[in-house]
């Protein structure tokens, strides 16, 4: 017998509750400028894709599309080939190359903060190199690019969108949905952000309002 809980009134359910009073705890809020050095993870989070063992070892930070797997392993192949070639300096010291794959923006932050400094840095494009140098990163431009890399937007062949502007307008009109990478760490996302901002803040806001989160 007796009523099931589904038949009980709200007041009857309240009567079953045990209430304890606790001392309110204030949250800690800091208005200090974030410490970039402290916020960055230890470099071990990004292990070496190629580890050189020469008397002189040159470490290069690279974006993932040059140090990944299969078709994205170009720089890894180059480094392994170099390391196997027996290059030596005039005084007989062996020279090797180490490759570490780090997202372009994160790599720039390591350089700006001084938390970890590679000998060479090849981001997805020059934007992050300029970003690092403009924020007091200790860099000198050796070459505009190491290998060609073109940014683009992929759509279905029969979509009718033939330019980036067409695709952006379609997103703004809520006809298609698009995702993009974090512009603070990825050159792809940064390219798109700058493309949108070329036509003003309203253009970016209208686009971003239709981006799923």
Residue ranges and their predicted role:
Residues 182-202:
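Bilobed "Venus flytrap"/periplasmic-binding protein-like clamshell domains
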Residues 108, 168, 193, 205-208:
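Generic detector of well-ordered alpha-helical segments enriched in charged/polar residues
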Residues 3-185:
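N-terminal segment of the mature folded domain
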Residues 125, 186, 209-213:
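Intrinsic-disorder/low-complexity, polar/charged segments
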Residues 199-213:
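Ligand-binding pocket segment of bilobal, Venus flytrap-like solute-binding proteins
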């Amino acid at each position: 017998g007796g009523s099931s809980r589904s038949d009980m009134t709200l007041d009857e359910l309240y009567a079953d509750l045990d209430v304890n009073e606790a001392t309110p705890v204030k949250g800690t809020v800091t208005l200090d400028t974030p410490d970039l050095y402290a916020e960055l993870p230890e470099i071990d989070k990004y292990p070496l894709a190629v580890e050189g063992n020469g008397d002189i070892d040159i470490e290069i930070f690279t974006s993932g599309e040059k140090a990944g797997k299969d078709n994205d392993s170009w720089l890894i192949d180059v480094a392994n080939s170099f390391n196997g070639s027996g290059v030596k300096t005039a005084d007989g010291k062996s020279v090797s190359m180490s490759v570490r794959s780090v997202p372009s923006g994160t790599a720039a932050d390591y350089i700006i903060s001084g938390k970890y400094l590679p000998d060479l840095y090849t981001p997805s494009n020059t934007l992050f190199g300029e970003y690092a140098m403009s924020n007091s990163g200790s860099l000198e431009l050796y070459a505009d690019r190491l290998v060609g890399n073109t940014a683009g937007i992929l759509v279905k062949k029969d979509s009718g969108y033939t330019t980036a502007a067409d695709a952006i307008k379609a997103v703004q009109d809520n006809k298609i949905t698009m995702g993009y990478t974090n512009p603070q760490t990825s050159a792809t996302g940064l390219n798109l952000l700058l493309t949108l901002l070329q036509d003003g803040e309203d253009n970016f806001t209208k686009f971003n309002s239709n981006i799923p989160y």
